[in-house]
């Protein structure tokens, strides 16, 4: 069984969100008597070379993808070759293959509702909000839905693009501050973005949460030790790893498989 990650081009470190999921996958494969081969691949147009090792595996678990519009042809290629694979990521109706993912829209909605319940009314969103990054986009749509229900808009000036790194979060928050548009809360599309934003706000002399509340998404270990500890949306990495392995093994056995969406959970800490 080959596990395979495609990190974003400018992120040389493994996203800590995937480390806990990797532990769950490792335990689940061991229980089933499978060996786990981990391969790190960069996005390229050479599909033959990229997937050469997959022929030696019973199946593939895919983690990470960067720009989905560039990544999707890889999935089409796997389907065409008859490879058994399951992917962690956005669950889309027209997507090739089988996917396991979190309920990103509901998670974005829940954390935004929490901020609104605290009296926040000018909520910014840090993270890409396009189909190129569908998980972030779903989180944005949940944020947008909560604002619309509260009869508040989601002005474009309060959305700043960012990939899932601390440095991107720092830059996005600095950009937000420089725009001069009032905001009293930040919904970050990932914890790494949120942690970078915390650093940028502190660097700008803005107190969290007295002046601005900050919330993330993922509940990585660093979220609880951030300063202040980060309110976030927990993705169930233990269940995710189990479902990825279970689904792939059913596929290998020739049994029918379907996409699965895993519920998220709001985790309230001191940042919001």
Task: Show where each model-derived region lies.
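Periplasmic-binding protein-like
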Residues: 1, 58-65, 124-126, 159, ...
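Alpha-helical recognition/docking segments in bacterial nutrient-uptake
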Residues: 1-113, 178, 192
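Hinge/beta->alpha junction and helix N-cap segments in small-molecule ligand-binding domains
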Residues: 7-19, 38-47, 66, 100-110, ...
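Alpha-helical structural signal in soluble globular domains
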Residues: 24-28, 77, 138-150, 196-204
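Residue-level detector of anion-binding/catalytic polar loops
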Residues: 34-35, 84, 121, 153, ...
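Glycine-rich phosphate/diphosphate-binding loops that line cofactor/substrate pockets in enzymes
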Residues: 112-123
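Flexible loop/turn connectors
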Residues: 170, 174-272
